[in-house]
Amino acid sequence: MITDAQFHMYLPDTSEHPWPRDPDRSKPPAKHARSFTPEEMLGAMEAIGVDRAVIVPPGWAGEDNSRALAAAAQYAGKFAVMGRIDPYDPATPERLEHWLEQPSMLGIRMSGKWPATPTQVQDAFSDPALEWYWAACERLGIPLMMLTRQFASRLLPIAERHPDLTLIIDHLSTQEGATAAEAFAAFDDMIALARFPRVVVKVGNGPSRSRQPYPFEDVHRYLRGVYDAFGAPRMLWEADITQLTKNTYAECLRLWQEDLSFLTAEDKDWIFHRATAEALNWPE
């Protein structure tokens, strides 16, 4: 079985499901403007042999998870959801208590910059006001996908204080860069988190940070470094399909299937499926 640990649904801004009007996210970036539906994702998955995928609602669309959950219900067994919630909303403490009771809801996706009205928080991961939030998610067993970009080091205090909280580092903690080295500027900070057993990494978007054609050899050393530090049972494959501009969905999968010689068959089973199933408590 192959599980894709992240894709974004891009659906229209409608009166029934409006996007928030905060200045930082009132509309998506231009490259995201076209629709990407669950049906399109199913077609892409079928074409390369991916069995199921995790829907991660995009940040600029707000905290309305209803359409993602509806897609998971419509295509049962194919999709589940890592939803969004505003940690600064006064209603959030009560909502967290029942978060995982929502059918197909697996956890929460967090951004470090939180463009919430009336206060825009530039570094939510380091905000002392959210200590209650990390503690609640730890107590309730809610996994958190953390969009750290180049700020992996900001997870260190959270991991130290909350050893039973599952923290999933998104996209190898990379950022856009002119070179692979620039994109992986936070690599050492990410590796430093490997000592915490509940910290895992989404690894599949390495090709998007490469500046070479397939098989993207300029990022292989980083992928090997993650493998050596975290091990396959803490590596989750994903392609982030809506972000692909220089490579294809098939190439993102093929790289891990064929071109990383250090991976064993058991490693691939973990990376393609079992690690996501365990980290997100999403059994077959």
Regions found by a protein language model. Name each.
Residues 2-12, 169-172:
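Histidine-centered catalytic micro-motifs
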Residues 10-13, 60-63, 88-91, 115-117, ...:
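Active-site environment of divalent metal-dependent phosphoester hydrolases
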Residues 122-236, 284:
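Catalytic pocket-lining loop regions of alpha/beta-barrel enzymes
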Residues 25-35, 81-89, 117-123, 179, ...:
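Active-site mouth loops of central-metabolism enzymes
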